[in-house]
Amino acid sequence: MSDRLRQPGVLELDELVAEGVSPWLDGLTRGHLASGCLTRLIARTGVRGATSDPAALAAAVESDDAYREQLAGLASDDICAADAVRAVAAYDVRWACDELRPVYQATRGLDGLVSMDLDPRLAHDVESAVAEAEQTLRAVNRPNAMVKLPATTEGIAAIRECVGAGFPVHVTAVFSASRYREALDAYAEGLRRALADGRRLSRLVSVVSLPVGLLDAEVDARLEDLGTPDALALRGEAAVARARHFYRMYDDWFGGADWRAMAAAGAHPQRLMWTATTVTDPSSSLTRYVEQLVTWGTITLMTLPTLKAAARRLDMCGDTLMGRHGAALEVWRRLEDLGVDGEGIARKLEAESVEGLAAAWRDLYAAVDAGRHTAHRT
C-alpha cells in the first residue's frame, strides 16, 4: 500500500481486507470505547473484531477513571469478587459488541465478534469451565460475544463441551500441529453434539489462535544460543512456517467429505487467527507479521500501535500461505536437525501462557478489589 491520499469511503486496511484477512483489535479496554477509538477503527480502518485480555483490563482499571462509577456500584459487600470482575469485563465486551454489531450483521456472524477470557483457575475442571462460560456469556448478553479457552489438555475437553452447548469459543495458546489437530477434533465433536441436540450450527462460530511472536521469540533465542551460520539464517522463520502448516491442515480439514456434511447443516469453519503480532525487533518492520500472514478467511490480531502502522502503510504481495506447505515443513526439518525441539517448545510456551494468564487474572482481581474499596471509602 502506498502513502497516497485515500479516497473517501476507502478503508485504511482495504487491501488487507480484500485478501480475505479480518483485522481485529487486541487489548480492548473501556478507554477504546469511551474515547470513540473503536468506533473510528471500525469506520476508517476496517477493524472487524476485538479481544479483551485481563492484563490490559487490570492496567486500565488501575489507571482509567472510566471505571470509577461502575466500581462504586460494585462496592457492596454483597457482591463477591468473582461477580465484580465478571461485571467489569462484561461491561466492556458488551459495549464493544454493540459497536461491532453492524459488522456482525453484515458478515452474517463471521466477524464483528468480541472475545474475552475466563478465569484460568477453572481450566482444570471441565464442568466448572463450562458453567463459567455460560455465566460470562449471559452477563454480556450479546450474540457476538465469545469466550476464550486455552488449548491445554483440560481446555480441549472444555472446548468440546462449550461448542456442544452452543457457546462461541476462541481457542488460545495453540503452538504445535498436534495441539491444533486436537482443537479441530474438539470443534468437530462439539458441532456434532450441538447438531444432535437440535442447535442451529449457523449460529456457532469459533476461532483458534497461533501466537506467532511468542513462537518466533523462543525459537530465535535458541538459534542465537547455537550461533552457527545455519542457525542464524533461520531466525524469524519458525512462526510463519508453522502458520503455513496450520493453514494446510485447515484447508485439508475443512475441504474434506466429513466437513462438507457439517457445512450442509450450516456449520462454519473454525478460522485461524494470528496473535502476538507486535514486533519488538527494531530492525524489523512493525507490520512484518501482518504482511507475511495473508490468506483468505484468516484473522490478524493487532495492538493499537500495530494497527496504526498497518493503516499507514502495508507492502502487500498477495497470498503468502497457500501452496507453501512444503517449504514450511522444510524450515521445521532444518530446525529439528539443529536440535530445536518443536514439541518441547510448544509445551513450554503453552505452560507459560497459562501461567501468564493466571498472573494477569490475579492482577485483575487485585485491581478491581482496590477500586471497589477506594469507591467504598469515598
Predicted features along the sequence, with ranges:
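Active-site beta-loop-alpha junctions enriched in small/polar residues
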Residues: D26-R30, A55, D117-A123, P150-E154, ...
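Active-site-adjacent beta->alpha loops and helix N-cap segments on the catalytic face
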Residues: H32, D125-A131, L149-V163, S176-Y187
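Conserved, mostly hydrophobic/aromatic
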Residues: D53, M116, V147, C162, ...
